[in-house]
Swiss-Prot record:
SS bond list: none
GO function terms (MF aspect): thymidylate synthase activity
Primary location: cytoplasm
InterPro entries for this protein: Thymidate_synth/dCMP_Mease, Thymidate_synth/dCMP_Mease_dom, Thymidate_synth/dCMP_Mease_sf, Thymidylate_synthase, Thymidylate_synthase_AS
Binding site for (6R)-5,10-methylene-5,6,7,8-tetrahydrofolate: 51, 169, 263
Keyword DNA-binding: no
Gene name in the database record: thyA
Protein's organism: Shigella boydii serotype 4 (strain Sb227)
UniProt subunit comment: Homodimer.
Enzyme class: transferase
Protein's UniProt name: Thymidylate synthase
Enzyme Commission no: 2.1.1.45
Similarity-based family: Belongs to the thymidylate synthase family. Bacterial-type ThyA subfamily.
Catalytic activity field: dUMP + (6R)-5,10-methylene-5,6,7,8-tetrahydrofolate = 7,8-dihydrofolate + dTMP
Length: 264
């Protein structure tokens, strides 16, 4: 995960001080890309411990089309708590857009099922895309999508994915995002009888919050360790039938966790 540490250093060296929606303040760069060959290991940051339980449960929650935090709470995941209303609702965020994008004539498009069908039946298509950025529903969302748009690509029997993330909290959010989409690529590849290829991450406003500077310097002082390996223990009937216990991370030996405040 040297690419991640290099990005941190780049933001420190080249970032512009900017104000932001949360009022915290950031150092920010615009436009950055990283590529992770998923054959080389599972891209889970090792210079601090990442909470893999939260990453897996959040992705399963997205794939169910759920937008209420009840499922997350049942599984001791609190990463969405700050944005939920008194009933636990978040509005039409990721899960809704992935699984039930509304059309003007009253139908709903299941984008995940659509891309699975494309991967199986038309893998050379240049339209194998999922978007969470629904302009017509942004004002109803508790938080506008940060990881907004992703595309799949098949070559030589391998499945790759590129994500465009319009806004990226490099210290807290990005390790989650990389691991989450890498996990999704593994799941989609298994469902389509493909090998995993690359995960390509592309960032827009890529920033470090001003109250994450000490934590960033601490993390940069640590030497990355070997990447772990993801094991998927079974192949479910569909992408929507995976369970938390289907996944195992082998060989994850990170440095200790580093706490930091969330900008709301």
């Amino acid at each position: 995960m040297k690419q991640y540490l290099e990005l941190m250093q780049k933001v420190l060296d080249e970032g512009t001080q900017k104000n932001d929606r949360t009022g915290t303040g950031t150092l920010s760069i615009f436009g950055h890309q990283m590529r992770f060959n998923l054959q080389d290991g599972f891209p889970l940051v090792t210079t601090k411990r990442c909470h893999l339980r939260s990453i897996i449960h959040e992705l399963l929650w997205f794939l169910q089309g759920d937008t209420n935090i009840a499922y997350l709470h049942e599984n001791n995941v609190t990463i969405w708590d700050e944005w939920a209303d008194e009933n636990g609702d978040l509005g039409p965020v990721y899960g809704k857009q992935w699984r039930a994008w509304p059309t003007p004539d009253g139908r709903h498009i299941d984008q995940i099922t659509t891309v699975l069908n494309q991967l199986k039946n038309d893998p050379d298509s240049r339209r194998i895309i999922v978007s969470a950025w629904n302009v017509g529903e942004l004002d109803k969302m508790a938080l506008a999508p940060c990881h907004a748009f992703f595309q799949f690509y098949v070559a030589d029997g391998k499945l790759s994915c590129q994500l465009y993330q319009r806004s990226c909290d490099v210290f807290l959010g990005l390790p989650f995002n990389i691991a989450s989409y890498a996990l999704l690529v593994h799941m989609m590849a298994q469902q389509c009888d493909l090998e995993v290829g690359d995960f390509v991450w592309t960032g827009g406003d890529t920033h470090l919050y001003s109250n994450h500077m000490d934590q960033t310097h601490l993390q940069l002082s640590r030497e990355p360790r070997p990447l772990p390996k993801l094991i998927i223990k079974r192949k479910p009937e569909s992408i929507f039938d995976y369970r938390f216990e289907d996944f195992e991370i082998e060989g994850y030996a990170p440095h200790p966790g580093i706490k930091a405040p969330v900008a709301i």
